[in-house]
């Protein structure tokens, strides 16, 4: 009887011991990371200048896009996805000044704490909203080809609105704990690394969210490749069947089909290759200091590429959305040319224009 009671007590203590061991491992890795000083010269001098250019360009392009989309009704799934993409890009753009001032050390150290707890979290949240929306845009173009005449539920505006709301709420709720769990006291020393503001639970949640976001990216990436292989085949077959001799226009229209994949791959793929080893280095006590700094620079470089997405998405609006192009002030005088190109190949237009 005594042995049974002793066994029961040992089992009840086991989960607590396991949790403490897990937390100890995480904190050991974090403490080693904290002792490794970062070489911030590039981050402090070069990237703020580059981000400033991206911010000014992005605010100009997205403000213009906002003005145009205000005058376009949300009458199709394609337009709804584009409008949500624009909102995500605008929010990302508005988060950049905080990063610029913080990284350049032009603002007090308290701003860095704000960046770690709020603006950086919002930036990443809206970035992944944009990634999923680019996947939905590719899916919408895919459906337009395989079901061009069928009025299925997936092509109705109510579906696009519902799935867009779900995406925003899902990413908001998994991102919110990253703000709440950055609850350690901020000091001039601790804000140099955002991980310093997190406890063991915060670091584990950060890892989990990173894994979820990696899963989101690679799922969207693979599906997008599948969609555009089908689209490429359709475009090729369309050109073969049409006996048009205007090869120049054919090449332009073919290029438009792949603008989503190009933007997606150039902006987001490098960051996701660099993100996994960087996050691992922050909680692994075996990563040496030099490698940590190299991974940090790689992460910051690829993060800059991801931020350029706010300037690249307007290319999607221009190349793929006919209604957007027609509303642009600089395109008003080109309606006649656009109409002649529209009549050139109706099937290709159905693929590329929304």
From Swiss-Prot:
GO molecular function, one term: G protein-coupled purinergic nucleotide receptor activity
Main location (coarse class): membrane
Transmembrane segments: 50-70, 78-98, 118-138, 162-182, 212-232, 253-273, 301-321
Protein location: Cell membrane
Keywords from the named record: Cell membrane, Disulfide bond, G-protein coupled receptor, Glycoprotein, Membrane, Receptor, Transducer, Transmembrane, Transmembrane helix
Residues exposed to the Cytoplasmic side: 71-77, 139-161, 233-252, 322-333
Membrane topology: Multi-pass membrane protein
Origin superkingdom: Eukaryota
A single GO BP: G protein-coupled receptor signaling pathway
Cysteines engaged in disulfide bonds, as pairs: 116-194
Function of the protein: Receptor for ADP. Coupled to G(i)-proteins. May play a role in hematopoiesis and the immune system.
Leftover remarks: Stimulation by ADP in stably transfected CHO cells resulted in inhibition of adenylyl cyclase and the phosphorylation of the MAP kinases MAPK3 and MAPK1 in a pertussis toxin-sensitive way. Inhibition of adenylyl cyclase and phosphorylation of the MAP kinases are transduction mechanisms that involve G(i) proteins.
Protein name, entry field: P2Y purinoceptor 13
Source organism per UniProt: Homo sapiens (Human)
Name of the gene: P2RY13
